[in-house]
């Protein structure tokens, strides 16, 4: 495994490449709201060691990517983040497999309906408008005129860090960043529309038993929506990527990819 971070038009990308080249499609990982590529590092290491070429991008205004002007950022839709995905995919030059988490799962769906992808993996993902949207009561109303700041730690722990120990939860909470209020509304209030007939690739959906943000029942609906294979993870919450036992999720994804003959 080799690590090689780079930038594409202000988009910071973490690249983990395998020791030996293969003909497999690259894996492009898309993080969720308020997060960054750091959230994928366990998976980047796991899959690159298994022979996959892995890229984890950062949306604009997230982690080490460049920041857009305030007015532009607060009005950004999740659909707009397909811009970052497209630029990274173009720089790779190969049709990828897209793996998205949470709000990044909606970004992945938006991208897949406008650009060709080999496969789509949706991990505790935001669901399309066609399936309704779980209304999450936040501690304070969303102010559309300013960036949305991560909620207080105890509330964030209930949403993001179920089944995560206190020390790890605080470490990850410290890495959270501001989000576009428009994107947050799309995720927890009214959703974005998806034309599933425009997504012509195999889809895997992963849901978690304890997830309050993207409830497991919603993940089952999402799998049915796409006629996709569904993986149910017991004893875990919304954050499946860094919690103890994350390997179970990575292995399920890898096994599914092999079933698709990748």
Model-predicted regions and their roles:
Residues 32-35, 209:
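Active-site glycine-rich loops that stabilize anionic/oxyanionic intermediates
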Residues 34-42, 54:
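Serine-hydrolase catalytic-loop signature spanning alpha/beta hydrolases and amidase-signature enzymes
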């Amino acid at each position: 495994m080799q690590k090689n971070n780079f930038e594409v038009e202000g988009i910071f990308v973490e690249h983990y490449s395998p020791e030996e080249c293969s003909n497999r499609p690259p894996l492009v990982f898309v993080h969720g709201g308020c997060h960054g590529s750091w959230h994928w590092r366990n998976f980047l290491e796991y899959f690159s060691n298994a022979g996959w070429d892995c890229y984890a991008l950062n949306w604009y205004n997230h982690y080490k990517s460049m920041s857009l002007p305030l007015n532009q950022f607060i009005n950004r839709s999740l659909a707009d983040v397909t811009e970052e995905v497209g630029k990274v995919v173009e720089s790779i030059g190969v049709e990828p497999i897209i793996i998205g988490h949470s709000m990044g799962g909606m970004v992945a769906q938006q991208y897949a309906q406008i650009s060709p992808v080999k496969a789509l993996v949706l991990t505790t993902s935001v669901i399309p408008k066609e399936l309704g949207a779980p209304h999450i009561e936040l501690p304070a109303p969303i102010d559309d005129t300013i960036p949305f700041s991560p909620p207080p730690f105890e509330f964030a722990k209930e949403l993001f860090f179920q089944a995560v120990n206190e020390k790890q939860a605080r470490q990850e909470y410290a890495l959270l960043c501001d989000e576009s209020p428009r994107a947050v509304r799309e995720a927890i209030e009214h959703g974005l529309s998806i034309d599933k007939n425009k997504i012509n690739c195999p889809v895997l959906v992963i849901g978690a038993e304890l997830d309050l943000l993207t409830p497991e029942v919603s993940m089952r609906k999402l799998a049915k929506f796409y006629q996709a294979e569904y993986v149910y993870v017991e004893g875990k919450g919304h954050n499946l990527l860094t919690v103890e036992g994350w390997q179970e999720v990575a292995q399920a994804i890898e096994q599914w990819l092999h079933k698709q003959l990748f």
